[in-house]
């Protein structure tokens, strides 16, 4: 017998395939405060027991592979393996289970969302023994949270920078999203900002196309910001989209924005990637720029109920990677978002501490310790009639963004902005006076419209517009 064979025998190596559950299903395991905990919605293939499916998820997203390997004997699997420690059937669903998996913290590189996701939502999602797999939630331990910078500035610092308190912030996405020249684009920004909005925004598609190169857009938008600030006496901003084909080009655009003295830049964090996003976030913190985050591509990942990843996980990942704003759905507009579920991950974005609450889709209690909060952005198919509901649902720490609801005003961009600002101020005043926005919302808007012809015109245009489809994202 060769020395190598003797060595393998001495560590108890036995070639072949064995059930995952023999190693990775550990219902007796007591989770540690330092474990990353994951809740997976697992749909096994017919004939695969839930214990084997849950153990397979734990194995394939940590130390396991399809067969025994002799190098297992060179390390401590008990220290590094993921463990499926609990399985619950999903009410009302046949052959679907919530499998809870605990991962030791040593499996992950410090300060890297990229590395965390490569393991937890990596190849396991293509595993043949599973019909479908969805990551519903993650518990990020405090020990891991503290390895991240998080948002560049956070909610309070942003309010101090802008000198705006006691109300939601107002924004507008410039439309048409593609095709305008840089000068016309800047003019549209100026009209919206002078009318009363706090921000205007590049659409997520706007990078540096032939019809409008990024440098020209940045210059004309900066002119719009400074001109509107001089006229209104308020601090204004435009989300200059720095997303680019390379990290180097992205940072170059952010540097130019800083040189122009504008307050905020923007990034498409899913299409751009978490490595790029974290790099940009760190640059923004070091150089005093706010960072607006768009979630383009999220519905490819989170829309299906039984496969992919819930947006609350993407929201937590963004808070780690860094961003001061992120789009979160509206509940009342044209884009997906059920109220309790949406408010669940909005709290995960803003609050220091969020209790487990399955009725809102929150599977784990989450502490963010001193990580700054992120402002949720409500955007997509909203207009002045939605203002009471938006104010009541999202509260002051939010950004309400009206694209078509500003630019579609029959009198132009500036009157559209005036209408939104008047509607918002009326709703905030009514709320502060103790009125019920949910019940009296339409009355509040009508009363304000008597004193604002711009608001009255907006009310008339959008009085019949509704987006009433059932939400896909339900418990």
Curated annotation (Swiss-Prot):
Highest taxon of source: Eukaryota
Post-translational modification: The disulfide bond which can form in the large chain dimeric partners within the hexadecamer appears to be associated with oxidative stress and protein turnover.
Ranges in coiled-coil conformation: none
Site (Transition state stabilizer): 334
Cellular component, GO, one term: chloroplast
Propeptide intervals in chain numbering: 1-2
Residues found modified as N-acetylproline: 3
Keyword Manganese part of the UniProt annotation: no
Sites of N6,N6,N6-trimethyllysine modification: 14
EC code(s) of this entry: 4.1.1.39
Gene Ontology annotations of biological process type: photorespiration; reductive pentose-phosphate cycle
Reactions catalysed according to its record: 2 (2R)-3-phosphoglycerate + 2 H(+) = D-ribulose 1,5-bisphosphate + CO2 + H2O; D-ribulose 1,5-bisphosphate + O2 = 2-phosphoglycolate + (2R)-3-phosphoglycerate + 2 H(+)
Keyword Transcription (UniProt): no
Chief location of this protein within or outside the cell: plastid
Binding residues for substrate: 123, 173, 177, 295, 327, 379
Localization per record: Plastid, Chloroplast
Active site positions: 175 (proton acceptor), 294 (proton acceptor)
Cofactor(s) annotated in UniProt: Mg(2+)
Keywords, ordered alphabetically: Acetylation, Calvin cycle, Carbon dioxide fixation, Chloroplast, Disulfide bond, Lyase, Magnesium, Metal-binding, Methylation, Monooxygenase, Oxidoreductase, Photorespiration, Photosynthesis, Plastid
Enzyme class: lyase
Function noted in UniProt: RuBisCO catalyzes two reactions: the carboxylation of D-ribulose 1,5-bisphosphate, the primary event in carbon dioxide fixation, as well as the oxidative fragmentation of the pentose substrate in the photorespiration process. Both reactions occur simultaneously and in competition at the same active site.
Recorded family membership: Belongs to the RuBisCO large chain family. Type I subfamily.
Other noteworthy facts: The basic functional RuBisCO is composed of a large chain homodimer in a 'head-to-tail' conformation. In form I RuBisCO this homodimer is arranged in a barrel-like tetramer with the small subunits forming a tetrameric 'cap' on each end of the 'barrel'.
PANTHER family in the record: RIBULOSE BISPHOSPHATE CARBOXYLASE (PTHR42704), RIBULOSE BISPHOSPHATE CARBOXYLASE LARGE CHAIN (PTHR42704:SF15)
Subunit structure: Heterohexadecamer of 8 large chains and 8 small chains; disulfide-linked. The disulfide link is formed within the large subunit homodimers.
Name the UniProt record assigns to this protein: Ribulose bisphosphate carboxylase large chain
Organism: Amaranthus tricolor (Joseph's coat)
